[in-house]
């Protein structure tokens, strides 16, 4: 799977499905489930590394986890899901040169075929233009952008007409800068529908309603493995509870059923 294949899926009216992975086991699960693409998201900072936000994860950690994810794929390379890697905080906000180096490192040293970054400020658009001209496929991300949590929080975005018009303008700018797809997170469904109507590239929703070209979810949320569930991504199973109960069953089975005989001294 390549970035151009996602565009063809939009053109053919086929819904795109993207799930996150953070190690070889989670990658094997989402590949077996049939996801079109796998995102090694900076959410692994919270899911795998125990941080409270996505901000602390480093480029080297993203590279490490992307390699681990790639080892979990069982299919031949041409049949594997599209592998996308998040550019972590401060790997692209400090200029195009640093961004090219960061994205180039990920694509050179891992099997990732694309990177994702957040925002559409003038500086970010310049970075995207540079990356695309260097041959690096880029997925955009608007709405709730976790790397801006200290400024925007985790609340729903673009709820008033002015901010909705701004987001639509940003989405068009991202397409013009060369993005092959756009993630819209936690925005009104009517806005996502209009963005989808205006763009030729796929619009992938998470908390943006059903009228998108595809959907993306954090796998740990769907499996019920996280302590706090996002309101737009309810768990499909009580995974944490099931796993704890299974482990407790094993631990209980190790308790001796009879009292051992008293120890005999060696003297």
UniProtKB/Swiss-Prot annotation:
Pathway linked to the protein: Cofactor biosynthesis; (R)-pantothenate biosynthesis; (R)-pantoate from 3-methyl-2-oxobutanoate: step 1/2
Gene Ontology CC: cytoplasm
SUPFAM superfamilies documented for this protein: Phosphoenolpyruvate/pyruvate domain (SSF51621)
Compartment list: Cytoplasm
Residues annotated as binding Mg(2+): 42, 86, 118
Free-text comment on the cofactor: Binds 1 Mg(2+) ion per subunit.
Catalytic activity: 3-methyl-2-oxobutanoate + (6R)-5,10-methylene-5,6,7,8-tetrahydrofolate + H2O = 2-dehydropantoate + (6S)-5,6,7,8-tetrahydrofolate
Keyword Cytoplasm: yes
Uppermost EC category: transferase
GO annotation terms (biological process): pantothenate biosynthetic process
Record-linked InterPro entries: Pantoate_hydroxy_MeTrfase, Pyrv/PenolPyrv_kinase-like_dom, Pyrv_kinase-like_dom_sf
Self-association state and partner proteins as the record states: Homodecamer; pentamer of dimers.
Protein name as annotated: 3-methyl-2-oxobutanoate hydroxymethyltransferase
High-level lineage: Bacteria, Bacillati, Cyanobacteriota, Cyanophyceae, Synechococcales
